[in-house]
Amino acid sequence: MILTNCAACAAPLAHDAPRCVRCKTRYCNSTCQHDHWRRGHKQICKKIHRGGNAEQYNADQKYKEAVAVAVEACADDTKGQTCYICTEAVHWKTKEGLVRGCACRGAAGFVHASCLAEQAKILIAEAEDNNLYPTERFYERWRRWDTCSLCEQNYHGVVCCAVGWACW
């Protein structure tokens, strides 16, 4: 996702708009850049830079928000269940709860959004390492971002949104 609005005033940006040297946050002009720096950008600039610059940092924040919404929306349905990928109820690293956003029935289909994202990243990396692009085998792996590997139905609703932000 390319950020197309000034971080200070939200005005649309030209393609060659000025940027923060460290984190690449974009501004409509140097006045907005200086104003944004004084209003607190300097406190988060290093964090944005470490997070992969402005666009990746923004996508990561949106992913975290979307996962929180998805876990909350699925909370009643997922009580007492475990992730079919890592077999844990609460993810060991992210501490996130389970989601369910496909057509699986019974005890199948409960998963952590971060487990789905990690599985998809591994499959895509494997496909790229094996030079499968642009074959059907590559696209089968790419579909893991939006399709359940168990029921082969598309994820929907808040789960689709969370996994979509993960693939950024």
Where are these regions (language model features)?
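RING-type zinc-finger domain of E3 ubiquitin ligases
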Residues: 46-49, 111-157
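Short functional micro-motifs and their immediate structural scaffolds
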Residues: 11-15, 27-28, 33, 37, ...
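Short linker/helix segments within small regulatory modules
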Residues: 16-24, 35-40, 98-107, 127-145
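Short Cys/His-rich Zn2+-coordinating modules
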Residues: 2-7, 58-72, 119-135
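Cys/His-coordinated zinc-binding microdomains
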Residues: 10, 24, 33-36, 46-49, ...
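Cys/His-coordinated zinc-finger cores
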Residues: 24-44, 107-125
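The −1 position to Zn-ligating cysteines in a subset of zinc-ribbon hairpins
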Residues: 5, 19, 26-31, 41-44, ...
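Small Cys/His zinc-coordinating "RING-like" fingers
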Residues: 1-18, 75-102, 150-160
